[in-house]
Structure formats: C-alpha cells, structure tokens
A protein has these predicted regions:
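Conserved beta-strand-loop-alpha-helix junction that forms the acyl-donor binding cleft
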Residues: 118-132, 151-152
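A short, internal acetyl-CoA/4′-phosphopantetheine-binding micro-motif in the GNAT/acyltransferase core
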Residues: 85-96
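Conserved beta-strand in the GNAT
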Residues: 55, 61-71
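A conserved beta-turn-beta hairpin within the catalytic core of GNAT-like acetyltransferases
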Residues: 73-84, 144
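A short beta-loop-alpha structural element at the N-terminal edge
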Residues: 1-15
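Conserved acyl-CoA
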Residues: 101-117
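Conserved GNAT-fold acetyl-CoA-binding loop/helix
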Residues: 21-41
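A short helix-loop-beta-strand connector motif used in the catalytic cores of GNAT acetyltransferases and
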Residues: 40-55
C-alpha cells in the first residue's frame, strides 16, 4: 500500500534513513547519523509544507520504503520543480513493485499538480547507483549535473 507520509511516520523513516546513511557514502561526508536530528528535520518539513512524500507499507503494517520530495521554483524563470530529497527502499525491496510505485506516485503527483520539472537524484555507495542512470533515462529524464562535495570541518 502506498500512502502519503504522516508526521507520525518520522521515527520509522529515520530507522530506514539510517540504513541508507550507512549503505551509501553519505556518512563519509557528514559524519555519524543523528536520528533525532533527522526526525526533527523531517517533521518540521512536513509540518510547514516544505516536504511531502509517500511511504510503502507492507502486509505487516511496517514502512518498507519512502520518498520525500520538496516543492520549489527555479531561480531563473520561476518554473515549478518537484525535487526528490530522498528515495529509499530496503535492499530486499529495491526494484520491487511497491518501491517502483513510490516513484510513479511522485511522478503522477508532479503531473497532476502541473509542475514544470521533476528532479531525481542518486548518491554514491548504494548498490543500485549504477542502475539508476538507465532507469531514469527510460523514464524520460536527462542528466543535468553532478554534485561535488568538500568537507570543511
């Protein structure tokens, strides 16, 4: 079952988020995962409307995957953008129908709400990293940029 994220989902999402944190290369740039900080940031974003998203709930009523997006406007011409902040499925659920439905739910939301652009990302270290290029291209996306990060402290 795919449903909208509720503020009450933040603890469960933080648990999955920590798995992502450890699986990806994120920890090597940002340090240790802070579950309380992650929960607060997600809760605030959901409460003030800067974040929205969806969860995939399994037969045991546990969240198996989630997608968080942010609504934005382009600086150069105010075209509307729905930007993925985080899309994560437990490794055992990647490529499964429910995880893919999260993507399609977000895409449908962007179309139904007349967004001009839908931006998806990928982070190094995750086992599905190399597969995402071909998946996104099949869905009509084009690569725009790569980000580089330098740790300053």
């Amino acid at each position: 079952v795919i449903r909208p994220i509720a503020k009450s989902d933040t603890p469960a999402i933080a648990v999955l988020g920590e798995r992502f944190w450890c699986e990806s290369d994120t920890f090597s740039y940002f340090g240790e995962f802070d579950s309380v900080c992650a929960q607060r940031a997600l809760y605030r974003g959901l409460a003030n409307g800067s974040f929205l998203g969806w969860v995939s709930v399994g037969s045991n009523s546990e969240i198996e995957a989630f997608m968080v997006v942010a609504s934005d406007k382009a600086l150069w011409n105010e075209s509307t953008i729905l930007r993925e902040v985080l899309w994560y499925a437990d490794e055992s659920k990647r490529g499964a129908a429910q995880a893919m439905r999260l993507f399609h739910t977000a895409h449908k939301y962007a179309v139904d709400n007349n967004y001009d652009h839908f931006i998806m990302t990928r982070i190094t270290g995750v086992s599905s990293y190399n597969k995402l290029d071909s998946f996104y291209e099949k869905c009509g996306f084009r690569a725009l940029e790569e980000n580089y990060i330098k740790t300053l402290s």
